Amino acid sequence: KVLSSYKLIVNPGVKSTSGTLLSNGKVCMIKTGMDDTDKFERIPDEDLLTLVQKQTFKYFWDFGHEYSGMARERTTSGDVVTTGGTGFGVMAMLVAAERGFITRQQAVERVQKIVTFLDKECTAYHGAYAHWINGATGATKPFSEKDNGADLVETSLLFQGLLAARAYFKENTEVESRLRADITRLWEAIDWTWFRKNGEDVLYWHWSPDYGFEKNLAIRGWNECLITYILAASSPTHAIDKVVYEA
């Protein structure tokens, strides 16, 4: 099937590299097409969905940092792990446990490793975490100039995963009860109101212990920003006012 047709016209006045003129012009017809033959074995939609879920999960599981369990920024990022990506990874682990890719015990152990690392070895800034963290030490890895402290949106992406895990691991066992308690403690420690910057009716993306709110980036938009306002409004300890959510 032809998708597009093009006509290439070479004018006889065109000179060669030696300076001579072409004796005759040329017209070439170029057509683009699509090779619609199968390149891989066809599989049912449900099998395709399972394969996509498995491969997505494998990134977070196989390439998770060996010490902290958190998600690496990319496969070549060494010790640099990402908070928001870790939230995505936690949710992938819940799917993996539910689908039987791993056991429930394996999933709860990995999530507990992540939570313990965040709790015991990472620096929290008014309860929020940096975008990048050294997965071996817990030290903040600056994401950009003057961005060496809290990233509230990345923290939100992290906690949407952790809160999903808290809801999923609901069995009355010592292991799952401990995980729920640890997640709750970290969740309740986030001071969302601090990020209003002098009480403004908007949340700010960054805060640095060295530069304060100098990056001055307000969190706005129907995108990854929305989860921040949902979590900030639903906090049991440091909820933002209704006017901030509605603004």
Feature-to-residue mapping (PLM):
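Active-site-adjacent structural elements in enzyme catalytic domains
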Residues: 55, 78, 105-120, 143-145, ...
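Acidic, low-complexity Ser/Thr/Gly/Pro-rich repeat segments typical of extracellular/periplasmic
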Residues: 1-38
